[in-house]
Curated annotation (Swiss-Prot):
Has four distinct domains: an N-terminal nucleotidyltransferase (NT) domain responsible for UTase activity, a central HD domain that encodes UR activity, and two C-terminal ACT domains that seem to have a role in glutamine sensing. This is Bifunctional uridylyltransferase/uridylyl-removing enzyme. The keyword S-adenosyl-L-methionine does not apply. Keywords: Hydrolase, Magnesium, Multifunctional enzyme, Nucleotidyltransferase, Repeat, Transferase. Residues 1-342 are annotated as: Uridylyltransferase. The lineage of its organism: Bacteria, Pseudomonadati, Pseudomonadota, Gammaproteobacteria, Pseudomonadales. PROSITE patterns: ACT, HD. Residues 461-583 form the HD domain. Uridylyltransferase (UTase) activity is inhibited by glutamine, while glutamine activates uridylyl-removing (UR) activity. Gene3D superfamilies: Beta Polymerase, domain 2 (3.30.460.10), cca-adding enzyme, domain 2 (1.10.3090.10), Nucleotidyltransferases domain 2 (1.20.120.330). Its cofactor is Mg(2+). It comes from Pseudomonas putida (strain GB-1).
Length: 900
């Protein structure tokens, strides 16, 4: 800490001001305010962070000493003001708590009571954010013995005012000779660290991480220092290196990483104007600017800043893991342990952990840097890597160069890892953590810590990739196999499962580079296959999967799967059943590894439908596709059989069906047609809207809830329907709109509840939905179609210009309207009003919410049931949609991207 810094605080000048003022409060406040401005100015000017946080602690020392001296303490030998915790370490950020201990020598301290109360009142009056306790030395010992947090705080202490002897007495009675021996303290701190990491999902890669508490955060560094202090009396990272727990290079890396997090935390406090350790979306853009991450694209600047953050915390996490493992081996060492078992000439087992047979293993035989991970995958009983060997890996990874990457021993070992029955994900994760994977595959190194600034991708690209591989592996185990039965079945019968793991490793590797990441990744995958001398068939499949890994999810979510042409086109693109099997499994794993909340029962049902229909088309033969007329005949014939068996008059059926167009029979299966027909024929002429509700499938974890509405076609019908569903907390995922020749609407909606599941067997909920919709549709003109709801905090930070695309389908008489926009309440109802205003008919809709954005596709026609053909009408429609969406956002955006 600085000895004297008159620009920050001049003692003589301050005391002179105190003498001139009747009340000291104004002088203290002025001194604190001016010093804060000086420190903030230094920060913005690029001052090093360590002197800044030490200078703030020095400033507070001086303020506290001046405040302490305002009171008559009498005999000061029995009282001391002690800094503890972070302030005790001499580290203070702009709004950090100032933790104080007023330490008393004896239980009888009545003579100090009045001065203590007045002193603490003054601190609050002058605006210091103080956390204080008043304890005797004996009380410190009693509470420290019972509370891990108390003993930790007392270990980091400094005397600010009063006799140092009191603090030394306190340190003596709380030493390892009396409580918390180093082994017990280490076990408690290790458990505390694990619990804290679990609170943050055991990942450094949260979208809104906590700079202090998340894995790899400042608290991890503090934890290893606390343990070292309890064991060795070591006070800082440099001293820790002196004890042999860190190499000098590791000490420098850990110190620079700590400085980076200190800068981020300091800036966070400045921007928030309060103690804030969470990297909320609210602050990420301002932080990126303040810390100097410049880019024409603000989103890209945020991603650059966050990538550095993630890489820093990953480094901290790796080094702290290494130190903690060293502590385990030293502090928890059992005199009778130490049994070793040779594995081969290069490695042995030591108490269940693998270690290098000698320090020169990786230098003499560099291929051992890959072999160690293959051995762990082949021997699942191996618990992990001993700390010294982890360090050897880190020290020798520079040997992984182009020569290493093309050595057949290394390429063979890497492929061998993917052929292991278990341990693929675990050991790829270790390779990534130790920095080996990014060295062996430089293209993978580019995506380490790379985030995408949105709510859809909740993991960095490298974490998502490894999660995908983990999900592929878990498909073979219950209960995961029960939730994904088809994917699990297909995974178990893939002829070469290692190929889907390799495709998964490369599927997003092209992200962060200019261009289509699927195409870039396919080029990288081709080079990988050539370097690893994979057979031609294997290479073609891997490259094709990387290039097309988004095709199946895009088709299922954005195309009309009831259209035979859509199925035939997709089947032509896939080509054969083997590719279809691989692609389906990869798609399921990709979606679930992107964002767990993205997967729902309806998306599962769509993918199964696309898989099943495509497989049927492939088996029928691509040269012999099913046409629309044949599909309509099959549906009508099967539905009529069901109705006749139930006693329905075929003439009544024929009369009703004659009023319906072909699209109705294309968009519904035979069972649903029979269900609808029976209910409509039994509906009284003046019975009001008919609302039917049922589940679309009996398979657990698949399907959605189907709501069928039959009613006279009325003004604002679609807008009222979707608004009512929104009020009922239903999420619409699919809509099929049919208008009969008798001007009745037959609308089918697929909905899910807010939890992402179908309504299921819940009579009360079904009745609530039926009653709510019936009431709204009975008098639609009286129902408010614009739903006013508060926009969630996170969504507010992801405004972007809406994108509206209008194009005509070359194979069907409809116009396709594609909308990508920020997710906002009431969006569908707003669009319904626009369709009404432009006299448009909605034929079908595919609704997808992806994080903070919606990607909706509407199939529309004009009043004559024809595709839109007037360019001026299309232009006005686009303009109206953009205006409505921007009104829903409540903020200005730049003009939309428009495509005809």
């Amino acid at each position: 800490m600085p000895q004297v810094d008159p620009e920050l605080f001049d003692r003589g000048q301050f005391q002179a001001e105190l003498a001139l003022k009747a009340s000291p409060i104004a002088a203290f406040k002025k001194a604190i305010r001016l010093a804060g401005e000086v420190l903030d100015k230094r920060f913005r000017a690029g001052s090093e962070i360590r002197p800044l946080i030490e200078a703030r602690a020095w400033l507070v020392d001086n303020i506290l000493q001046q405040a302490w001296n305002q009171f008559d303490w009498g005999d000061q030998s029995g009282i001391a003001l002690v800094a503890v915790g972070g302030y005790g370490r001499g580290e203070l950020h702009p709004h950090s708590d100032i933790d104080l201990l007023i330490l008393l020598g004896a239980a009888e301290h009545e003579q100090y009571r009045d001065a203590i109360e007045r002193f603490l009142t003054l601190l609050w009056d002058i605006g210091l954010e103080v956390g204080q306790s008043v304890r005797t030395v004996d009380e410190c010992a009693e509470q420290a013995r019972a509370d891990l947090t108390v003993i930790t705080n007392l270990m980091e202490s400094r005397t600010i005012c009063g006799p140092e002897a009191l603090r030394q007495r306190m340190l003596e009675v709380t030493s390892t000779a009396h409580m918390w021996p180093s082994k017990e303290f280490f076990l408690a701190k290790r458990a505390e660290l694990k619990a804290r990491h679990h609170k943050y999902n055991d990942t450094e890669y949260n979208l809104e991480p906590n700079v202090k508490g998340s894995p790899g955060g400042l608290r991890d560094i503090q934890t290893v220092l606390w343990v070292a202090r309890r064991q060795y009396g070591t006070l800082n990272l440099h001293a820790l290196a002196g004890e042999g727990f860190l190499l000098e290079s590791e000490n420098e890396l850990l110190a620079s990483s700590q400085d980076f997090l200190w800068k981020v935390r300091y800036a966070l406090h400045m921007l928030a104007g309060r103690a804030e350790d969470r990297l909320l979306f609210d602050h990420q853009r301002s932080l990126a600017t303040l810390l100097g991450y410049g880019d024409d694209n603000p989103k890209r600047a945020i991603e650059q800043f966050m990538q550095q953050y993630y890489r820093v915390v990953m480094s901290i996490s790796q080094l702290c893991d290494l130190i903690v493992q060293h502590f385990e081996e030293v502090i928890l060492a059992d005199e009778e342990s130490g049994s070793t078992q040779p594995l081969n000439a290069r490695f042995r087992l030591h108490d269940g952990y693998i270690e290098a047979a000698n320090p020169n293993v990786f230098k003499r035989t560099p291929f051992a840097m890959l072999e160690i991970f293959v051995l762990m995958a082949q021997r699942p009983e191996i618990k992990g890597v001993r700390a010294d060997t982890v360090r050897l890996l880190r020290e020798h990874r520079h040997l992984i160069d182009d020569t290493f990457r093309t050595d057949i021993r290394n390429t063979s070992l890497f492929i061998e890892l993917f052929k292991c029955e278990i341990g693929i994900h675990r050991n790829l994760r270790r390779m990534n953590r130790y920095g080996i994977l990014g060295r062996y595959l430089p293209e993978f190194g580019l995506i380490v810590g790379q985030m995408q600034h949105d709510l859809f991708h909740i993991y960095t690209v490298d974490a998502h990739t490894l999660n995908l591989i983990k999900h592929l592996r878990k498909l073979q185990y219950t209960p995961v196999s029960e939730k994904f039965p088809l994917a699990s079945k297909l995974m178990g019968r893939l002829p070469k499962p290692e190929l889907i793991y390799l495709a998964g490793l490369y599927h997003d590797i092209g992200k962060g580079r200019q261009g289509d990441h699927s195409e870039i990744g396919a080029v990288d995958a081709q080079k990988f296959c050539e370097r690893h001398q994979l057979p031609a068939w294997d290479s073609r499949l891997i490259v094709w999967l990387v290039q097309n890994h988004l095709v199946m999810s895009t088709t299922a979510q954005r195309k009309d799967l009831s259209d035979p042409q859509v199925i035939n086109d997709f089947a032509l693109h896939v080509g054969d059943e083997t590719r279809l099997d691989y692609l389906y499994v990869l798609t399921v794993a990709d979606i679930n590894a992107t964002n767990p909340s993205l997967w729902n029962s309806w998306r599962a049902s769509l993918l199964r439908q696309l898989y099943t229909e495509t497989k049927r088309a492939l088996r029928r033969g691509l040269e012999n596709p099913l046409d629309r007329e044949e599909q309509i005949r099959q549906t009508q014939s099967s539905a009529l059989d069901i109705l006749v068996r139930e006693g329905t008059d075929p003439d009544d059926v024929e009369q009703l069906w004659s009023q319906l167009g072909d699209d109705y029979f294309l968009k519904h299966n035979a069972a649903d047609v029979a269900w609808h027909t029976d209910a409509i024929l039994q509906q009284p002429a003046d019975g009001g809207p008919l609302v039917l509700i049922k589940e679309t499938t009996q398979r657990e974890f698949e399907g959605g809830t189907q709501i069928f509405i039959y009613a006279p076609d009325q003004h604002d019908f679609f807008a009222v329907t979707v608004a009512a569903m929104s009020q009922l907390n239903l999420n619409i995922h699919d809509a099929r709109i049919i208008t009969s020749s008798s001007q009745f609407t037959l609308d089918t909606y697929i909905v899910l509840d807010n939890d992402g599941g179908s309504i299921g067997d819940n009579p009360q909920r079904v009745k609530q939905i039926r009653d709510g919709l019936t009431e709204a549709l009975r008098n639609p003109e009286d129902y408010p179609t614009i739903i006013q709801r508060r926009v969630p905090r996170q969504l507010k930070h992801f405004d972007f210009p809406p994108q509206v695309t209008i194009l005509n389908d070359a194979q069907r008489p409809v116009t396709i309207l594609e909308i990508t926009a920020p997710d906002r309440p009431g969006l569908l109802a707003r669009l319904g009003r626009i369709f009404l205003e432009f006299d448009l008919s909605l034929q079908n809709a595919k609704i997808a919410t992806l994080g903070e954005r919606v990607e909706d596709v509407f199939f529309i026609t004009d009043a004559d049931n024809q595709p839109l053909s007037d360019p001026q009408l299309c232009s006005r429609l686009q303009e109206a949609i953009v205006q409505q969406l921007q009104a829903g956002q409540g903020s200005d955006t730049s003009p939309t991207r428009v495509t005809f």
